Amino acid sequence: MTLLGTALRPAATRVMLLGSGELGKEVAIECQRLGVEVIAVDRYADAPAMHVAHRSHVINMLDGDALRRVVELEKPHYIVPEIEAIATDMLIQLEEEGLNVVPCARATKLTMNREGIRRLAAEELQLPTSTYRFADSESLFREAVADIGYPCIVKPVMSSSGKGQTFIRSAEQLAQAWKYAQQGGRAGAGRVIVEGVVKFDFEITLLTVSAVDGVHFCAPVGHRQEDGDYRESWQPQQMSPLALERAQEIARKVVLALGGYGLFGVELFVCSDEVIFSEVSPRPHDTGMVTLISQDLSEFALHVRAFLGLPVGGIRQYGPAASAVILPQLTSQNVTFDNVQNAVGADLQIRLFGKPEIDGSRRLGVALATAESVVDAIERAKHAAGQVKVQG
């Protein structure tokens, strides 16, 4: 039996978000729908989830002592990481002391960097992956590239949104690729992964829920990447029944090996009927924002339902749908959005994240659309995103 308290009352059920970006904001909203008290934590003030939380704190989440202090102050029943850059050793300590880390502290530690999850998938679970090598110096990086061959991809073992990634075609790129990888890591300079390029027809995110009533799968989400970050996503991605069966089997093995209740974003390469594991996030995935319009329960609602110990039951997918990011480039601490009236309509929505500032290129919103076909939904979402004029 799941007992939920009422926010701001002595018996409140308290959820602490570690990371308060646009994904955390939607998790906070879903918690609010259930009367759950929300505490939003991030490294900067006025982050999106802080706008809809009961309280907020600004700390360096890589500082274990600072993390412990805010947890001891707020006494959350659930600690919900939204990002990778967190003091995961402290999360393990806190879990050992009886706190509930979502989905579990081991999952957050293993997926905090690409090495932990790659070794779990390829070496422990024996799942198909790309060829890979790890390196923690420029000389070892060059050896790894020579081993893997061209073309290949280098990524910091800990980064997000494509930061620090380079697609390497020749030796002339190596010095710059190493330098860029060292600048792009979430926790500063350090270790990298060099991956062989996988031949694939398309990439998917298989949003997979581990809940009290078993493992559930959303329809596969297709997406287009540019500069390591997603630009559009759509659902459902068409694939063969055999490929879908293999994708679900890989996702099931990964989430059960990681453990705990919650939603996982399992990234996979698909080539005909073959499926290759890429990465996994033990939390809602940015490409899954399409589920805000495509499903009866969004990925955020599913995450909250699962970690609170509630049954999922089933997931209803409404048909062809897409998301397209609103990604302006400017510098401002007072952003405004014009022409919004032309970005919304029947079966057409937008989400503006409320990020407090922009310096360069930053994802500030997303357009969401449904249509008779995935192709039409993508075009509708892209057109809507293009209608929003960001000023500052």
Curated annotation (Swiss-Prot):
Keyword tRNA-binding: no
GO CC, any one term: cytosol
One Pfam family named in its UniProt record: PurT_C
Listed EC numbers: 6.3.1.21
Binding annotation for ATP: 114, 155, 160-165, 195-198, 203
BP GO terms, sorted: 'de novo' IMP biosynthetic process
InterPro entries, sorted: ATP-grasp, ATP-grasp_carboxylate-amine, ATP_grasp_subdomain_1, PreATP-grasp_dom_sf, PurT, PurT/PurK_preATP-grasp, PurT_C, Rudment_hybrid_motif
Pathway named in the protein's UniProt entry: Purine metabolism; IMP biosynthesis via de novo pathway; N(2)-formyl-N(1)-(5-phospho-D-ribosyl)glycinamide from N(1)-(5-phospho-D-ribosyl)glycinamide (formate route): step 1/1
Domain ATP-grasp: 119-308
Residues annotated to bind Mg(2+): 267, 279
Reaction catalysis annotation: N(1)-(5-phospho-beta-D-ribosyl)glycinamide + formate + ATP = N(2)-formyl-N(1)-(5-phospho-beta-D-ribosyl)glycinamide + ADP + phosphate + H(+)
Keywords of this entry: ATP-binding, Ligase, Magnesium, Metal-binding, Nucleotide-binding, Purine biosynthesis
Residues that hold N(1)-(5-phospho-beta-D-ribosyl)glycinamide according to the record: 22-23, 82, 286, 355, 362-363
GO molecular function per UniProt: ATP binding; magnesium ion binding; phosphoribosylglycinamide formyltransferase 2 activity; phosphoribosylglycinamide formyltransferase activity
HAMAP family the UniProt entry points to: PurT
Subunit structure: Homodimer.
Family, as annotated: Belongs to the PurK/PurT family.
Protein's job: Involved in the de novo purine biosynthesis. Catalyzes the transfer of formate to 5-phospho-ribosyl-glycinamide (GAR), producing 5-phospho-ribosyl-N-formylglycinamide (FGAR). Formate is provided by PurU via hydrolysis of 10-formyl-tetrahydrofolate.
Full protein name: Formate-dependent phosphoribosylglycinamide formyltransferase
Organism: Shigella boydii serotype 18 (strain CDC 3083-94 / BS512)
